[in-house]
């Protein structure tokens, strides 16, 4: 059973905080957090990510970027990454995590979700759409696992 989920990207200021909040929206009973492989530790959400999320009635307020660690990984049942290379990096940090690390876009044909950092608002909108779709798919899969419709 996956009750505690960690979402991981690079800086922990664009994709993973948005994905974290979307998963919480679609499956409120989960414990969801986020972290970065090269986190901009202590920073809030990227202003463009926050603006796009806000336009979709999703708040990234009070987000604070944090660095991934082996210890942090061990606290979660499932770790979701944005790119395949993130899975490899996490397995280097904590090899014992290999069986519980998957792509956030797993249910969307194993889709990798590109990094919009320092790109156009259109790039952030496109990434938001991918994140929202994948978050809905994860929520459905997790509900099915728990025997919920």
Swiss-Prot record:
Catalytic activity: O-phospho-L-tyrosyl-[protein] + H2O = L-tyrosyl-[protein] + phosphate
Similarity comment: family membership: Belongs to the low molecular weight phosphotyrosine protein phosphatase family.
GO process annotations (BP): polysaccharide biosynthetic process
UniProt EC number: 3.1.3.48
Hydrolase among keywords: yes
Active site: 9 (nucleophile), 15, 115 (proton donor)
Record's protein name: Low molecular weight protein-tyrosine-phosphatase Wzb
One GO MF term: protein tyrosine phosphatase activity
Pathway(s) per entry: Glycan metabolism; exopolysaccharide biosynthesis
Domain of life: Bacteria
């Amino acid at each position: 059973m996956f009750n505690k989920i960690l979402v991981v990207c690079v800086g922990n200021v664009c994709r993973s905080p948005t994905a974290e909040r979307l998963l919480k929206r679609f499956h409120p009973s989960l414990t969801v957090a986020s972290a970065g492989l090269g986190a901009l530790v202590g920073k809030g959400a990227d202003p463009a990510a926050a603006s796009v999320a806000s336009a979709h009635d999703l708040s990234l307020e009070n987000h604070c970027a944090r660095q991934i660690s082996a210890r942090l990984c061990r606290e979660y049942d499932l770790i979701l990454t944005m790119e395949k290379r993130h899975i490899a990096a996490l397995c280097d940090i904590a090899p014992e995590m290999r069986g519980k690390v998957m792509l956030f876009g797993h249910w969307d044909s194993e889709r990798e979700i590109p990094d919009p950092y320092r790109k156009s608002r259109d790039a952030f909108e496109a990434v938001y759409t991918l994140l929202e779709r994948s978050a809905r798919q994860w929520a459905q899969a997790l509900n099915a696992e728990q025997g919920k419709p």
